[in-house]
């Protein structure tokens, strides 16, 4: 089903299921003996969502390499890719803490548990924004686990298509102090104009010294819808009904680095391949089966 301007979802369907998929990847990467990341909450959160495909994947009962055009090396690269992505954004927040930033905003937070697992200074406030049912689910599951946030956590149940800047201010965001923003795994699910509007709003709410991190997929401009639809077929055959071709917004859009620089941010990007090299992992071979291609991880600081 194609996206609409007011579509809804939970963590087992549509865009929400991709958040669960990402958390399953974090759970698997957390078991890796190389110890690149440690997210102890990812696995219990995925189990609580209850999507059988992801549970079997975490338990080793389903090997991704049985899927068409997915070799064992490619399956491992999927997990490694989640490891380097998670570490990049964990390190980003670590650098923000070291610089003295004491408020963080996680947009479309999904099953992100950084408020619970990162070593925040005691006076830090972490704001999380997502759809109401997603916020409620994660909050309740983590409470049932006895987990306690390691910072002051302020969860804001709002769709990012709504007036989230007003909601964020109402929740206590101090726009006179620097903020560390995170938009992880979000941009491909936004129309091009909504991507620009997101960074316009972030800029308007940010004091000098603020930072922002995200990832950008240049291949979304000429995204191969047919190939993505074909790739979704084998997943459906194994019980996972996610059709990426219907979830993402394709077409021309501004490059995030260029757009942020034009807004006064000092922005830099690093490719996923470079992150693999940086972390001592085998760089995946380029694949014609990947409808998105390379991913660029971006961090920026607001000057002035």
From Swiss-Prot:
Enzyme class: transferase
Binding residues annotated for S-adenosyl-L-methionine, in chain numbering: 130, 159-160
One Pfam family, short name: LCM
GO BP: methylation
InterPro entries, A to Z: Ppm1/Ppm2/Tcmp, SAM-dependent_MTases_sf, SAM_mthyl_Trfase_ML2640-like
Alphabetical list of SUPFAM superfamilies matching this protein: S-adenosyl-L-methionine-dependent methyltransferases
Molecular function GO labels: methyltransferase activity
UniProt keyword annotations, A-Z: Methyltransferase, S-adenosyl-L-methionine, Transferase
EC number: 2.1.1.-
Function of the protein: Exhibits S-adenosyl-L-methionine-dependent methyltransferase activity.
Similarity-based family: Belongs to the UPF0677 family.
NCBIfam families according to UniProt: mthyl_TIGR00027 (TIGR00027)
Protein name, UniProt field: Putative S-adenosyl-L-methionine-dependent methyltransferase MMAR_1057
Source organism of the structure: Mycobacterium marinum (strain ATCC BAA-535 / M)
């Amino acid at each position: 089903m194609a996206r609409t301007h007011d579509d809804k979802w939970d963590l087992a369907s549509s865009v929400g299921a991709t958040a669960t998929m990402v958390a399953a990847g974090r759970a698997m990467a957390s078991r890796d003996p190389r110890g690149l990341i440690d997210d102890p909450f990812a696995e219990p959160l995925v189990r609580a969502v209850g999507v059988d495909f992801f549970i079997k994947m975490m338990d080793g009962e389903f090997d991704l390499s049985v899927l068409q055009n997915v070799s064992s090396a490619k399956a491992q690269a999927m997990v490694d890719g989640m490891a380097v992505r998670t570490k990049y954004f964990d390190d980003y927040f670590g650098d923000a803490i070291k610089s003295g930033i004491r408020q963080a905003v996680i947009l479309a937070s999904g099953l992100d548990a950084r408020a619970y697992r990162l070593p925040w200074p005691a006076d830090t406030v972490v704001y999380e924004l997502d759809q109401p049912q997603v916020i409620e689910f994660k909050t309740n599951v983590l409470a049932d686990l006895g987990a306690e946030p390691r910072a002051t956590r302020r969860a804001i149940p709002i769709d990012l298509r709504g007036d989230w800047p007003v909601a964020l201010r109402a929740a206590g965001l101090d726009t006179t102090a620097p903020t560390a923003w995170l938009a992880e795994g979000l941009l491909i699910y936004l129309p091009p104009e909504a991507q620009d509007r997101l960074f316009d709003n972030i800029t308007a709410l940010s004091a000098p010294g603020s930072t922002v991190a995200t990832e950008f997929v240049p291949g979304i401009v000429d995204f191969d819808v047919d190939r993505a639809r074909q790739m979704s077929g084998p997943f459906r055959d194994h019980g996972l009904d996610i059709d990426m071709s219907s979830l993402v917004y394709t077409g021309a859009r501004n490059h995030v680095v260029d757009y942020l620089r034009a807004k006064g941010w000092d922005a830099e990007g690093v490719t996923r391949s470079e992150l693999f090299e940086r972390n001592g992992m085998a760089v995946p071979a380029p694949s014609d089966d990947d409808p998105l291609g390379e991913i660029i991880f971006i961090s920026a600081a607001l000057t002035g």
